[in-house]
Structures are given as C-alpha cells and as structure tokens.
C-alpha cells in the first residue's frame, strides 16, 4: 500500500524531500551530464543511492507539462536500495492554460502587464482544466508511489501590502483590466457593488484583503473540486 508517509506508532511524519529530480535541459548541463554520467540510467542509479543515503522520502519529477518518471530512471529513483520513495507533481493548471492561450483563444496572455490570476475568470478556464486534470490523472492511475497533486506553487499571491499588482491580487488592478479580460474585471466590479464601495478612491485595506481572499477561495474551490472529480 501507500505507507510512505505513515508512522506505525501514529507519530508525526516529516516530509523530507526534494523537487525537480531530473536532468537539466541547458546546453552546458547536457554537456556536463554526458561527461559525468554517460546515461540517464547511470545518473539515476547514483542519484537514487544519494537519496536513500540522506533519508529522502519524497521527490518530484517536476516537468512543466506534468509527466510520470521515465522508465529508464523510475526504479532507481523511487526504490533505491530497500527504500520506497513517494512523489507528487504540480499540475500547473493556471500556467498551462496561459501557455495554451494562443492555440485555444487566438491570442497570448500579457504576463508582463496583468496578474495571471485574472485568467481564472475566463469563460473557457473551467472546461479547459477539467480536460487537463482528466488527462493527467490517467497517467498516475494505479501508481503505488504517486500520492497526489499540489496546486498552489504556481500562484502569484505574494506582494507586500499589494505593492505590485502583478505579484499580488490587487482590486484596483482587476478594475482597470481591458475588455479582453472583462470577466475578471466584472468580478471585481461586482465585489465593489456588493460591498457598497463607490469608487477606487475609497477602497480600504480590509476591502483589498477581502477581495484577495475571495479570489484565492475561488481558485482553490474550483481546482480542488476538479482534481477530486478524477
């Protein structure tokens, strides 16, 4: 069974892990990798021993377009020596929608101008991530080492006192969005109406925090429900 992170005496278990356990993709890395290891099989054998020797109990593969560990390295990394290692992956639901916008919607997202969380409210977002989760969940069905997905590693939530609209969730930023992102703008406008806020000039810190909370709740509720569906 999946007894990777359970203590038989019901004690606390600390996940002692590392992310992105895979060869790099830069030219310099590929050259050094070939010289040092020669093959992925040799690299994974040595890396697996290193993981086991340091009592690692969790790793991730970390591909942007989420995928399982390749067969050539899987055994060496997930069952080094006598140890079983668990893994989980980041679904990158928001980013993948953004990456595929040109193909699906005919235009690219201006990531340097707008907070990517505005894409939550695009009319096709929920349908898109439903298909994506269904596709990716099938990859891990029956995998005894796989313990689940995580969702929030991709989110631009952190910005000190909302100082940077592109790194936080800023109500004024949402209200100023162009017609192309009107779904997110209308979400912010409804928030203003529902809370009796007459103009941007009277938005308080509490209003900002309440709006941040609503957007975060919307993301987590939608994505969690979608993942649990499959």
Show where each model-derived region lies.
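Active-site-adjacent substrate/metal-binding segments within catalytic domains
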Residues: 1-80, 96-144, 202-204, 209, ...
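Polysaccharide-binding and catalytic clefts of secreted carbohydrate-active enzymes
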Residues: 8, 102, 111-120, 138-230
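A cross-family glycoside hydrolase active-site/sugar-binding cleft signature
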Residues: 16-17, 62, 88-90, 150-152
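Structural preference for beta-strand elements that scaffold enzyme active sites
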Residues: 58, 84-88, 144-150
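Active-site beta-loop-alpha junctions enriched in small/polar residues
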Residues: 64, 92-96, 152-156
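Acidic, His- and aromatic-enriched active-site or binding-groove loops in soluble protein domains
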Residues: 83-100, 175-182
